[in-house]
Structures are given as structure tokens and as C-alpha cells.
Amino acid sequence: MKKTLAALIVGAFAASAANAAVVYNNEGTNVELGGRLSIIAEQSNSTVDNQKQQHGALRNQGSRFHIKATHNFGDGFYAQGYLETRFVTKASENGSDNFGDITSKYAYVTLGNKAFGEVKLGRAKTIADGITSAEDKEYGVLNNSDYIPTSGNTVGYTFKGIDGLVLGANYLLAQKREGAKGENKRPNDKAGEVRIGEINNGIQVGAKYDANDIVAKIAYGRTNYKYNESDEHKQQLNGVLATLGYRFSDLGLLVSLDSGYAKTKNYKIKHEKRYFVSPGFQYELMEDTNVYGNFKYERTSVDQGEKTREQAVLFGVDHKLHKQLLTYIEGAYARTRTTETGKGVKTEKEKSVGVGLRVYF
């Protein structure tokens, strides 16, 4: 019998939890190790940098390792520590194909209660993460972080006491600061100060509802970035992300519409506005095989200046060979038209296709 999409989603979470290995479980303390090794073979072509030939690569695609320790105090109270590492070196550096240096992607502690919610402190995802419904494995065409940061150095609160509903709020703190002289310090920047162009602080609030075949999510964020050497001059980003979707459970089909709007207020220069809309779908073609895709239209404009319009499409198919083995093929195409006063119209195109394999552990 064909599974419903809701059952697939529940099963996916269960499988994710099952992939982690419990290495210690005693007196209310549980320690899990898990992760995945991901490889992708791809062909890509872009006119952005006047590239004329296709480039092929075999590289890392988001391989990761995590350790999670949870201690239950009783009466629904718990504490949790989480650490996740990633590979960060670019393929163009040292011929590493993205399997170079290892860094901490997320590192945080959580204090919570099943009835009252939880407080999370550290480098973690924010409530803005997972707002949009579009599915992708590698070539996602939605740039959510241009609207609201989806992770960072944060203090956050999340409430999950109502079935299907998640409420959350985050306060973002500066994460990237200048080092001392001789330690990658930029000219004219003060050691210990926030780097120019990086997050100074910010706030986010959001709500996510996913039940009764309805998906509705929305988040708002106000983020301040350091603009120049003066601590008083900031670049402020106000953004909204939202999604609305419906599951046709009997058909194994999810249809959704993602959207976003943002306005960037710059010090002494023209402000910038952007928005996007993106219809998408996810369909269970057969057991353990899914088809997904989405289209995006995005427009960016500077007051009385440059205007950019981007159209992009993504399509993919994934198949679970085993509960811990996933393979997929995915492709994306994007065309960007930039209009600037006195310079005419410039068109840029990008296309990529890849075949990937993920082994979970």
C-alpha cells in the first residue's frame, strides 16, 4: 500500500533518529553519535565569470559528524549539549574537493521543559531556519539568509507545547570579530571589534504550523550589520519569510508557495529592496522514491538605481536504497537580468546538474 506524505515525513524523522548510535545511556543521561558522508559528481556552467566551458567535479557535499548529550532531570526538565562539525575548505584550495579543514558548524547547550519550552544558547539554527518548504539536496535556488539569518551566535527560545505548532524567538549576537595585529586584521579595523559587513546584533520571531495537512510558517527578523569603522553607523536588514502549503495525503503530494520580502537601510547610500515568490511541490512517485521541484522569481532594486530580476528552477529525484543510504539526481538553472542606468541590460546564466550519494551513520 502506498504511504501518505505525512507518514513519510514522520518516518524520515524516525529514520534520522535511528541513524545516530547511542554510545551511553545510564541514569537519565543519553549520548548519541551520528552524521553522514556525502559525495556528489557534478557538471556546472556559468556565464557570471565569463566561463565558457562546463566544469566537472567529484566533491564533498555537506558531510558532517555530530555528538549529542541529553540529561533528563525528571518532571519533564532536561539539558542538552550538541556539537556538529563540517568540512569547509573550498575545492579550489589545495585540491581538497571540499574535504579540507574541519570546523564547528553548530555548538550549543539547551535547557528545557516539555511543557514550558526550551532555551538554547550558542552557535545554532534560528527560528528562521526551515521556514520555506522547497526541497533541495544541493542546488537550492532560495537565498533565505539574504532575508533573515538562519543561524548564528544566538540566545533563543522555542515553545512546542501545542501539537503541530512551534513558536520561537532569537536574539543574535556578533560572531566574527577582528583579531590582533598580524592575525588577519583588516586595515583601519580595531582588534576585538565586529568585522565590517558582519552581524552586529539582531532579533527574530516566528511561528510554524504543520498539522491536519496544512503547512503555514512565517518569520520576521531585524538584523544590524556593521557598516564602517564607526560603531554608530549600521546597515539594517528588515526581512520576512513565509510559506503556505497543503498536503494531499492520499496522493502523497505537497504543494507550497514560499515568499520573502526584505529592505536594507544603508548609512548615507541608497536603500535596497528585494522580494521573491516560489511555488514548489514534493511528490512520492513510489515507495522510497520522491520527486521534487520549485520555481523562483526574485527582484532586487536599489532606490533610483540598479534593478536585478532572477528566474530559477530546480528539479530533483531521490531514492532510498537502504534506511541509511540515499541517492539522488538534481539540477538547477538560473537566469539573472541586471538593468543599470546608463549601462543597459546584462544577462547572466548558471546551470548545474549532479548525482549524489549519502551514507548515514
From Swiss-Prot:
Under what name is this protein listed? Answer: Outer membrane protein P2
Provide the leader sequence positions.
1-20
Organism source for this protein?
A: Haemophilus influenzae
Subunit structure, briefly? Homotrimer.
The role this protein plays is: Forms pores that allow passive diffusion of small molecules across the outer membrane.
Q: Which InterPro entries match?
A: Gram-neg_bact_OMP (IPR050298), Gram_neg_porin_domain (IPR033900), Porin_dom_sf (IPR023614)
Q: Where in the cell is it found?
A: Cell outer membrane
According to its UniProt entry, one GO biological process term is: monoatomic ion transport
